[in-house]
Amino acid sequence: MNWIKFSKWADVLDSEDGKYEFPCVYVLTEKDGTPLYIGKAATKRRVKGGTTWSGGLRQRYYHDWTVLDACMKGTGRHIFIAKVDQRKASAIEKQLIYENKPEYNENGKTTAPKTSWVLIHKGTRPKMKKGLA
């Protein structure tokens, strides 16, 4: 997993990488990179009724960017994002939640997922309890 680190949600929107309109796993962290919340955005860009809809993380939080930035201001917290295969996004999210047990994830911390992989973390990455660096 090739992680990219951001300090503001607005920076994700302004990034050069397609504004994250693709399937990804994201981690909201403390200053030191410890996961607080792990999620996925697995919807690809699509066309519905002649209108093109954004996909991925941009669609997931489209109306909440400024609120999320306001909540994060001055905290030193970060957002880490890794592009993933849409078919594996849910399984990877479940595995990361189970292994790291982030404070703000309500589900998935006690039951092991049905499938798991050896995840290799690259780039500027969050502080994960498992996986290869």
What are these regions (language model features)?
Residues 1-36, 40-133:
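Boundary/linker segments flanking structured domains
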